[in-house]
Design a protein with these regions (language model features):
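Short, flexible segments with low predicted structural confidence
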Residues: 2-3, 35-39, 52
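Short, surface-exposed ligand-recognition loops at beta-strand->loop->(often short) alpha-helix junctions
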Residues: 10-22
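Short, solvent-exposed loop/turn elements at beta->coil junctions and helix N-caps
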Residues: 41-44
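Short, low-order "capping/linker" segments at domain edges
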Residues: 92-100
Length: 100
């Protein structure tokens, strides 16, 4: 059954431009190279929730867990951590509608 990797974070203060360049030029293409299918991304503009919420898909939870153990993910994730704070992630079975 398809599964989602749901990630949430806030952009680190004073790193907005570098963050944006990284997301566009490295993070999203890197996720695709690993094999993730792009889902949706949301930006929170009001309230006490994570500023960014993104999900990507793979065919199963097992596939996601294997991808998260790979060197490509570790490198990509490590670089993301240079630009974000309050990062969280979880793996869930995909269902229709909004999941967080």
């Amino acid at each position: 059954m398809p599964a989602k990797l749901i990630m949430a974070w806030d952009i680190a203060p004073q790193h907005e431009q570098e963050y944006l360049e990284f997301i566009i030029n490295e993070f999203m293409p890197g996720l695709q190279r690993i094999g993730f299918l792009m889902g949706d991304a949301w930006v929170t503009v009001y309230g006490k929730y994570s500023q960014i919420l993104v999900y990507v898909l793979l065919p199963s939870k097992k596939d996601i867990k294997q991808a998260l153990q790979g060197e490509s993910w570790k490198e990509l994730h490590g670089k993301l951590m240079e630009y974000v704070v309050n990062y969280s992630q979880k793996v869930v079975l995909a269902s229709a509608g909004f999941q967080f």
